[in-house]
């Protein structure tokens, strides 16, 4: 219904026309709808978010502040609901009893629980809905007058030297995005973009994990694990105060629910801590071991890596406190001009011939 309305609103008079004709229209309501969700380019708005949808698989919400990948599964909504449900149950059935318990002061523990749940929600939204580090498209096009023909040398790797004589950094030309990808970058076929320091595409968050949101991803795993532990502890104490289990069935339900749900984020958090401690991304690690099943392989340090600081502690500190970097493809800029070739989707080249 919203899509049909937004397709038809192009035929409506704009706000400028309404002011010139002295008539009142619903242009402000239309602008508000296009601010909430961007389905197509809206000529009546001072900001143009629709140009981004032509070169990526993203859909933008709330004036370009929130994004998600289109035509994918709704796992992210399911994940969000799964870690909200136990908090709702705890708030309704458990919190009041523990808060007013006369024997033991549980108020600090409850405050800490809600703090980590708030951190879980915020880090989930930042990791799932923010820019992972998208690289602009169509930056390295050799000849615009030759129908964007790609020369043969662009199909090779560019090897760059490092301070370590035994290590080198390779750069590859992306035929889809038409750029020389920066080191550690990779192209995501789901998002249809190249991402800086690409770690992996997380289907549970429906977003890529890269340089600009990797720390939020780790914070989400850490905060969700701690929240589950606190829920198990508080519900266990609530259950111990009850003479029989049948009087507090919700406590037992929360314990079982969180006891089963804690393992996946906990194992994933430990896995990424060891990866980050060796300055390796998931993409680099899977490529080095030649397998898509990393759980069966031991994580070892690459001594010749130019990114390793020879200390797990300093590697983690650098990862956690490094600058996120600039948003290179900002959907909230004043205007994306149609003539800007960075926002045009060129045909993919499959050979050395003219495309």
Curated annotation (Swiss-Prot):
Chain intervals for the UniProt region annotation (Disordered) = 1-23
So where's the catalytic machinery, residue-wise?
202
Question: GO CC: one term?
Answer: Golgi apparatus
Topology of the protein relative to the lipid bilayer: Multi-pass membrane protein
Q: Which residues lie on this side of the membrane: Lumenal?
A: 94-108, 237-249
Q: Which InterPro entries match?
A: Palmitoyltrfase_DHHC, PFA4/ZDH16/20/ERF2-like
Q: What is known of its domains?
A: The DHHC domain is required for palmitoyltransferase activity.
Tell me, in a sentence or two, what this protein's role is.
Answer: The ERF2-ERF4 complex is a palmitoyltransferase specific for Ras proteins.
Quote the protein name from its UniProt record: Palmitoyltransferase ERF2
**Upper lineage ranks?**
Eukaryota, Fungi, Dikarya, Ascomycota, Saccharomycotina
């Amino acid at each position: 219904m919203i899509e049909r309305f937004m397709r038809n609103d192009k035929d409506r008079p704009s706000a400028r026309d309404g002011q010139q004709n002295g008539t009142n229209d619903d242009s402000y309501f239309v602008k508000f709808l296009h601010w909430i969700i961007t389905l197509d380019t809206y000529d009546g708005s001072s900001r143009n978010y629709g140009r981004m949808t032509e070169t990526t698989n993203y859909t933008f919400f709330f004036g370009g502040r929130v994004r998600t990948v289109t035509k994918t599964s709704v796992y992210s909504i399911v994940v969000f609901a799964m870690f909200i449900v136990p908090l709702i149950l705890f708030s309704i059935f458990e919190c009041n009893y523990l808060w007013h318990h006369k024997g033991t002061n549980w108020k600090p523990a409850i405050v800490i629980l809600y703090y980590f749940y708030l951190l879980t929600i915020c880090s989930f939204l930042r990791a799932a809905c923010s820019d992972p580090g998208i690289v602009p498209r169509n930056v390295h096009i050799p000849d615009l007058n030759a129908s964007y023909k790609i020369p043969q040398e662009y199909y090779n790797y560019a090897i760059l030297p490092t301070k370590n004589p035994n290590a080198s950094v390779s750069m590859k030309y992306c035929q889809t995005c038409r750029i020389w990808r920066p080191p550690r970058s990779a192209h995501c076929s789901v998002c249809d973009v190249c991402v800086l320091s690409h770690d992996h595409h997380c289907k549970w968050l429906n977003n890529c994990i890269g340089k600009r949101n990797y720390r939020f991803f780790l914070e989400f795993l850490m905060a969700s694990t701690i929240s589950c532990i606190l829920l198990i502890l508080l519900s266990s104490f609530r259950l111990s105060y009850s003479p029989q289990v049948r009087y507090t069935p919700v406590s037992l339900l929360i314990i079982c629910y969180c006891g089963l749900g804690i393992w996946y984020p906990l194992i994933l958090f430990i896995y990424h801590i060891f990866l980050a401690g060796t300055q390796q991304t998931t993409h680099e690690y899977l490529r080095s071991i030649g397998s898509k099943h990393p759980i069966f392989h031991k994580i070892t340090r690459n001594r010749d890596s130019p990114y390793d600081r020879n200390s797990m502690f300093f590697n983690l500190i650098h990862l956690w406190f490094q600058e996120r970097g600039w948003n290179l493809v900002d959907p909230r800029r004043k205007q994306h001009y149609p003539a800007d070739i960075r926002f045009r989707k060129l045909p993919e080249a499959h050979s050395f011939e003219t495309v």
